């Protein structure tokens, strides 16, 4: 196919001859609606449509509100800024902080303390009344006079060292001279003025820092729940070796436990003072130091301020 035939196909109008290839190219480029353009237009349109469909965004899954709804929400609730909040969590994801609410003290602490002291005073009065119904020692502690104690031990080879009464029992220690390897020590006690008696064995105590020529024994005696007031409660000590028996009877007077009389007058005075004190609703002025000890000579415990009220019936050590 020559150039003349191509031009006849492209433009059916008659053309002068001869025709050069340059003329064919110029006619193709300058044609108003060349056939090639119309031939290729369907492919370009299809390509453009595919590109548009390929890059079209997907529809969002979140439903958007209309402008009217947004306006209504804005009119009903004004826009407020959210406050920043910091939360701490522990290793298990639980809250790390705990909130405790404390109420302010509405009552005076000093008033509460005075009420407590008043209640303690009532309890002490009851304890004193209960103690006065029991027994008390009718003799001083033997070891309080150490020289006399040593002389009696040297003379009798056995001597009561100390004795105390705790609730419904009597406990004490006994010193004996080490004159024999085998020793048997007893406490002979009576609760009915020696109409009958009971021998209570003593227990040997190991003397870590004691002397080699003296041994120590201890005893504990349970007192009966009731003893007639006219009956005497007394005891003495016996120390037996393989061939001898030694006694300590407090120089013939025995060791007596006396009935303590109930001082009802003193208890009634204290009870009346406490009753009047509570009825008035007042508390005496008390001064407290920084360590919490009461400094008063006329407060709840005036005997704390005097050495004269300290008993001397404790062991000498």
Swiss-Prot record:
What the entry lists under CDD domains is as follows: PBD_PPP1R3C
Which residues does the UniProt record annotate as the domain CBM21? Answer: 150-258
The entry's free-text remark on domains says: The N-terminal region is required for binding to PP1, the central region is required for binding to glycogen and the C-terminal region is required for binding to glycogen phosphorylase, glycogen synthase and phosphorylase kinase.
The answer to whether UniProt assigns keyword Repeat to this entry is no
PANTHER family named among the record's database cross-references: PROTEIN PHOSPHATASE 1 REGULATORY SUBUNIT, PROTEIN PHOSPHATASE 1 REGULATORY SUBUNIT 3C
Per UniProt, subunit arrangement is: Interacts with PPP1CC catalytic subunit of PP1 and associates with glycogen. Forms complexes with glycogen phosphorylase, glycogen synthase and phosphorylase kinase which is necessary for its regulation of PP1 activity.
Protein name listed in UniProt: Protein phosphatase 1 regulatory subunit 3C-B
**This protein's UniProt keywords:** Carbohydrate metabolism, Glycogen metabolism
Q: Which gene encodes it?
A: ppp1r3cb
A GO BP term here is: glycogen biosynthetic process
Q: What does this chain do?
A: Acts as a glycogen-targeting subunit for PP1 and regulates its activity. Activates glycogen synthase, reduces glycogen phosphorylase activity and limits glycogen breakdown.
A GO cellular component entry from the record: protein phosphatase type 1 complex
Q: Does the keyword Signal apply?
A: no
Q: Which organism is it from?
A: Danio rerio (Zebrafish)
- Gene3D superfamilies referenced in this protein's UniProt entry, alphabetically: Carbohydrate binding type-21 domain
The protein's superkingdom reads Eukaryota
Pfam families attached here? CBM_21 (PF03370)
Q: Under the GO molecular function aspect, what terms does this record hold?
A: glycogen binding; protein phosphatase 1 binding; protein phosphatase binding
Q: Which residues form a coiled coil?
A: none
